[in-house]
Regions:
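Gram-positive cell-envelope targeting signals
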Residues: 1-69, 337
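Short, electropositive alpha-helical surface patch
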Residues: 134, 223-225, 330-346
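Sec-exported extracytoplasmic/periplasmic mature domains
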Residues: 196-204, 245-249, 314-317, 338-343, ...
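N-terminal pre-catalytic segment of deacetylase/amide-hydrolase enzymes
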Residues: 58-63, 69-72, 131, 147-225, ...
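Acidic, His- and aromatic-enriched active-site or binding-groove loops in soluble protein domains
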Residues: 230-235, 239, 342-351
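Solvent-exposed, low-complexity, repeat-rich "mucin-like" stalks and linkers
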Residues: 67, 72-110
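Serine/threonine-rich, repeat-prone extracellular segments and beta-strand-based repeat modules
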Residues: 110-148
Length: 381
């Protein structure tokens, strides 16, 4: 009675073993299929990649544009270099002649070539470091360059021609002659002749900062340089302002700022591109002193004078230059002006300015209302 049961149990065991073997075979087959598919995809990817890399250029990129060719030719490192002749760093005094030693192009073996080298335009008329740039183009169209450093040191003894700072006062119309007409008044037609002459003869009008650099031996100004200054304020030169604009001629108006109740009253003048407002002090253009013409400036304490000057700077919107009231000043006045932050101060003493002159005691060329154009030209040249 136990034998049939044992036979049934054996069949079941054999069936389970066959099922396990079958499952293992299926899993193994699945793994093999996945590996084959992965290998096939990798092969396709590599084939496409190699085919693309080795394919000839299409009609779109076969020739390329001229600009692209030029850019490709100029990219990368050239086999040629520019070699400076002489020192790569040179020092020269302002105003002294400078002769450039030049440069040549050499190939990778160090052989000199006949490739031409151009030197970019440079200006050594100011003190400081200047970079001289040399350029050339190699046979493949690549641009190569080199630089030489030229340091210009200050020099006050280079033989400057002299800078005229012209001193004008009042401008009037011949149809409305002032009752107190004197040599400080110039007729608007006479002034226009002078401005027209300056414009047509390409005169240069330096800023006060450039004037200071000129005095310190740090800048060479063009031979035809001039500064136009008008004392006492813009109210006295209303007729001149349109002429400054017409002939594109910059001018300075030295303003007595106490004449204006509010600094906004100076806005129309301050915003004019051809008119610069500078200080003629706030309230020191009056008597009360015992020095020179009796101006009050030399008689005031340093604190009082400084407060006055700082107020005038606030009103003018500039503090580069000062005109001494009545031309009166002392060494103490100069120190106060410098402490207030001014770059320059002008007097009424006659003459042109030269490098090395005291920046706080500058001479001026007086402009007379009776002068002819020829006299004007003679005075400034």
């Amino acid at each position: 009675s136990r034998q049939p049961h044992m036979q049934t149990s054996g069949r079941r065991q054999r069936h389970r073993r066959r099922s396990r073997r079958l499952r293992r075979r299926r899993r193994l087959f699945g793994i093999v299929v996945v590996l084959i598919l992965a290998a096939g995809m990798a092969g396709i990817f590599l084939w496409k990649r190699s085919h693309t890399a080795g394919s000839p250029p299409t009609s779109e990129n076969k020739g390329g544009s001229k600009d692209t060719k030029k850019k490709d030719a100029q990219s990368g490192t050239s086999d040629y270099t520019i070699e400076l002749q002489g020192d790569s760093e040179v020092t020269v005094r302002l105003g002294d002649p400078y002769e450039d030693a030049g440069a040549v192009v050499k190939d990778r073996q160090g052989n000199r070539t006949d490739i031409s080298v151009s030197l970019e335009e440079y200006d050594l008329n100011t003190a400081g470091e200047h970079q001289l740039v040399y350029k050339a183009t190699d046979p493949k169209g690549k641009e190569i360059s080199a630089q030489r450093t030229v340091t210009v040191t200050p020099n006050k003894e280079y033989g400057a021609k002299g800078l005229p700072i012209c001193m004008y006062h009042y401008v009037y119309d011949a149809n409305s002659v002032p009752e107190n007409l004197n040599s400080n008044y110039i007729e608007v037609g006479t002034l226009e002749e002078e401005l027209k002459y300056l414009h047509e003869n390409d005169y240069y009008f330096p800023t006060w900062k450039e004037v200071r650099e000129y005095l310190d031996g740090e800048r060479i100004l063009p031979d035809k340089s001039i500064v136009l200054s008008f004392d006492d304020g813009p109210l006295y030169i209303e007729l001149a302002i349109p002429l400054f604009e017409k002939y594109q001629t910059p001018a300075t108006s030295f303003v007595i700022t106490s004449y204006y109740n509010d600094k906004s009253m100076l806005d129309p003048y301050r915003n004019n591109q051809y008119l610069t407002l500078e200080s003629h002090t706030d309230n020191m253009h009056r008597g009360g002193g015992t020095y020179g013409h009796g101006g009050i400036f030399p008689a005031l304490s340093k604190e009082e004078a400084l407060a006055d000057l700082k107020k005038s700077i606030e009103y003018c919107g500039n503090g580069d230059a000062l005109a001494y009231p009545f031309g009166d000043y002392t060494a103490e006045c100069e120190q106060t002006v410098e402490e207030a932050g001014f770059l320059c101060a002008v007097t009424t003493e006659p003459g042109k300015c030269y490098p090395g002159d005291d920046p706080y005691a500058l001479t001026r060329v007086r402009m007379l209302g009776s002068q002819s154009l020829d006299q004007f030209i003679s005075e400034i040249n």
